[in-house]
């Protein structure tokens, strides 16, 4: 998650994925996300908590966005900063100007870069040549901010534990890749149920399995995968840029819809998750999407809180570190009282 700045020996922290994080650091981020969420609920109109006051965040969007754009722009505003939205086509990432020059220039103007791109190599190049934090807001390879919010939602609801069984039903896409990457760090049981030919990134899978404290499975029978699941998770069957494959994908994924029959295979207490946008009647039935076990809107909301916590960690680490020092002192004091 961190890398050396060029020449000055100090640390620049990026968030391109879960590499460099351990379980303790992720739980710390979840605890700070809870604090951020509580701050918003109790002090929404207060000017007291503005840890990135007067800082600017350049936001590069090469892909359409609703949740990512709104949650990041609002998050920057609520933390006291200012977001500058840049459409990828207008600045010509890697075409009109080189990625290296864009990274160096934005580093002179801004305090962080948030990028939602197609090629993962572009965000890696941005991070390599920028002197400010770079956050991966989605690439074709991964979507770590989404999965961070997903796992936080389970943590917040008291559902996260070492033996939790999370079943991702659908395409081995960028969201599935990030779940696999997380499963290489946190000890839990992750199952990807996908058709043959729609597997996740082989390199990420191999690396996660070599590090995994829990279990990572790839199955091709969705009903078998769903048995005794604590979480049933899905995403669209046809992602941006795959529209020409839609007919073929609809046929391949037809048995992989999360519906009442599949939910019946999971634990009675199981929750339903979807990163959205959702296509009711395709990857998930309307009955399940809007049913009592769905926590889909909760996870969408939590994008805001987790990303705010992440930005404070990257842009004002002193505030982030002070919270955790205080948090540890409180816990120690409570243990002594007990």
From Swiss-Prot:
Name where it's found: Cytoplasm
- A Pfam family annotated for this chain is OTCace
Q: In which pathway does it act?
A: Amino-acid biosynthesis; L-arginine biosynthesis; L-arginine from L-ornithine and carbamoyl phosphate: step 1/3
User: What Gene Ontology molecular-function terms does this entry list?
Assistant: amino acid binding; ornithine carbamoyltransferase activity
Q: Which GO terms describe its biological process?
A: arginine biosynthetic process via ornithine; citrulline biosynthetic process; L-arginine biosynthetic process
- The answer on whether this UniProt entry bears the keyword Transferase reads yes
Report whether Cytoplasm shows up as a keyword of the record: yes
**The EC number(s) this enzyme carries:** 2.1.3.3
Q: Which domain of life is it from?
A: Bacteria
Q: Which UniProt keywords apply?
A: Amino-acid biosynthesis, Arginine biosynthesis, Cytoplasm, Transferase
Q: Which reaction does it catalyse?
A: carbamoyl phosphate + L-ornithine = L-citrulline + phosphate + H(+)
* Principal location class: cytoplasm
GO cellular component terms attached to this protein's record: cytoplasm
Q: What does this protein do?
A: Reversibly catalyzes the transfer of the carbamoyl group from carbamoyl phosphate (CP) to the N(epsilon) atom of ornithine (ORN) to produce L-citrulline.
Q: Which family does it belong to?
A: Belongs to the aspartate/ornithine carbamoyltransferase superfamily. OTCase family.
The name on file for this protein is Ornithine carbamoyltransferase
């Amino acid at each position: 998650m961190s890398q050396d700045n060029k020449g000055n020996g100090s640390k620049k922290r990026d968030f391109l994925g879960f590499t460099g994080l351990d379980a303790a650091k992720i739980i710390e981020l979840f605890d700070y996300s809870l604090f951020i969420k509580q701050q918003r609920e109790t002090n929404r109109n207060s000017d007291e908590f503005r840890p990135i006051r007067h800082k600017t965040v350049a936001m590069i969007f090469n892909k359409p966005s609703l949740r990512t754009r709104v949650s990041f722009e609002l998050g920057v505003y609520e933390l006291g900063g200012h977001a500058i939205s840049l459409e990828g086509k207008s600045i010509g990432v890697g075409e009109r100007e080189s990625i290296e020059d864009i990274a160096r220039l934005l580093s002179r103007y801004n305090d962080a870069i948030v990028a939602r791109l197609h090629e993962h190599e572009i965000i890696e190049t941005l991070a390599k040549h920028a002197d400010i934090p770079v956050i991966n807001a989605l690439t074709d390879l991964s979507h770590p901010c989404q999965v961070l919010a997903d796992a936080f939602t389970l943590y917040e609801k008291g559902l996260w534990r070492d033996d939790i069984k999370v079943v991702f039903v659908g395409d081995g896409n960028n969201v599935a890749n990030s779940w696999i990457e997380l499963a290489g760090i946190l000890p839990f049981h992750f199952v990807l149920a996908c058709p043959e030919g729609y597997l996740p990134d082989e390199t990420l899978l191999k690396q996660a399995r070599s590090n995994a404290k829990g279990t990572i499975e790839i199955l091709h029978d969705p009903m078998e995968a769903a048995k005794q699941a604590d979480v049933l998770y899905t995403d669209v069957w046809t992602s941006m840029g795959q529209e020409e494959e839609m007919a073929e994908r609809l046929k391949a994924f037809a048995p992989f819809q999360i519906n009442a029959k599949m939910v019946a295979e999971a634990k009675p207490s199981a929750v339903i998750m979807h990163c959205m946008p959702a296509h009711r009647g395709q990857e998930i039935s309307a009955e399940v999407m809007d049913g009592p076990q769905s926590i889909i809107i909760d996870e969408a909301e939590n994008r805001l809180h987790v990303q705010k916590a992440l930005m404070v960690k990257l842009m004002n680490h002193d505030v982030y570190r002070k919270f955790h020092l205080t948090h540890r002192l409180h816990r120690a004091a409570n243990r002594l009282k007990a």
